[in-house]
Amino acid sequence: WKMDERHGATTVNAKKYIDFAAANQIEGVLFEGWNEGWESWGGMQNFDFTKPYADFDIDEVVRYAKEKGVEVIGHHETGGNIPNYERQMDHAMQWYTDHGIHVLKTGYAGAFPNGYLHHSQYGVNHYQKVVETAARHKMTLDAHEPIKDTGIRRTWPNMMTREGVRGMEWNAWSEGNPPSHHVMLPFTRMLSGPLDYTPGTFDILFLNTKDSPRRQKWNDQDKGNSRVNTTLAKQLANWVILYSPL
């Protein structure tokens, strides 16, 4: 995610994905790693939510996407640094809407301060503050590393979907999710509401990146033989079964 020779969220790459989306009638594209702060990953996670990296021209990306009829989906990864996010949240959401971006994915891939858990009163109050702030800015939310769904989308319909599951990403750095995992989700996790599992990986053996010198080991669970335990047909089926209005 950080800006180096492996940086993915660049203006050039963004246009490639926008072109692909337009050609395949995909309505929106999400870009992660576009903003300054990823170089602090593993530390205090001091992200700046209104300062793009030098190789990501957000004005040009949004202009190009609009020209192609594609929505840009925003991204706020907090790393669990709640005080840092809350200081910037209102301004950052307004900044997005000023750029014509009205859908936002949030992330909390890290520990909350002072040992607070995601489901603590501190965490629940924060998540509610995000939903209400987004509503004021007429933004739709997709929360990753969220608290469990309790039906608040009936009151706050901008809370469109959330992760809250061992999702697709686990296949990239571990033994992966077993085939039985997807069979259980509709009868367990999905009882509470929409599930943003992020299905749709067609390179199930990671052949495009497996031997790339640019590939980087993520953690100790990555043994170098990660793959998606699925078939192409199942990936298509997951889009239908694992409901997420995003």
Regions found by a protein language model. Name each.
Residues W1-N24:
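An acidic-aromatic substrate-binding cleft motif
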Residues E5-A9, H118, N225, N229:
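Conserved aromatic-histidine-acidic binding/catalytic patches
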Residues E32-D222:
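Aromatic- and carboxylate-enriched substrate-binding clefts and catalytic-loop regions
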Residues S212-L246:
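Glycine-rich, aromatic-lined ligand/substrate-binding cores of catalytic
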